[in-house]
């Protein structure tokens, strides 16, 4: 059990008790966000991301021992019957790993998928979105390891055809990145 000083609307500080549960991992962040809409990358003022943190922790800054972020770039492309590229999309899977709370566990923060490059030919519409279906504990209650599954869903549409595809990735607090397809 921990105590924290909390500012109230009247400017008076009060003490609030709260509990950090290192054995319960939660997602701090959005579960679904668009990264490409109407064939153009979505520009965000703040990066949409997910985290696998202990319950009761509200910021990655409450943890220590973070490692350098990992990143891997993936590319998809579609060609027409003439062999011309009609959609060429590159995206990055990024995350920071290894954070611990008072020496316990290995957690993930800043897990995201960002557009790196996009070219779409005339007559084609490309859309992509990211979803975080699950955040889990890969370790034990005394020494949790946060894990996050991330899916990137995209569609390529023309007047006569629509195609939808998904790629899935899993990242964890030990720094592992695995393609699930």
Regions found by a protein language model. Name each.
Residues 45-181:
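Mature extracytoplasmic or otherwise solvent-exposed domains
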Residues 3-46:
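Membrane-inserting effector segments that mediate pore formation, membrane fusion
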């Amino acid at each position: 059990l921990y105590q924290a000083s909390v500012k109230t609307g009247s400017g008076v500080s009060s003490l609030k008790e709260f509990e950090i549960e290192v054995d319960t991992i939660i997602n701090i962040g959005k579960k679904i966000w668009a990264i490409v809409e109407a064939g153009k990358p979505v520009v965000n003022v703040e990066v949409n991301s997910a985290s696998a943190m202990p319950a009761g922790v509200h910021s990655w800054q409450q943890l220590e021992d973070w490692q350098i972020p990992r990143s891997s770039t993936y590319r998809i492309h579609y060609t027409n019957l003439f062999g011309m590229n009609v959609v060429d999309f590159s995206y990055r899977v990024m995350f920071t790993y290894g954070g611990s709370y008072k020496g316990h566990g290995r957690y993930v923060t800043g897990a995201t998928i960002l557009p790196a490059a996009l070219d779409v030919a005339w007559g084609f519409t490309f859309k992509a979105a990211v979803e975080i279906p699950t955040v889990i504990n890969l370790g034990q209650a005394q020494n949790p390891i946060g894990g996050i599954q991330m899916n990137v869903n995209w569609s390529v549409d023309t007047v006569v055809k629509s195609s939808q595809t998904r790629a899935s990735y899993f990242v964890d607090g030990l720094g592992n990145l695995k393609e699930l397809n």
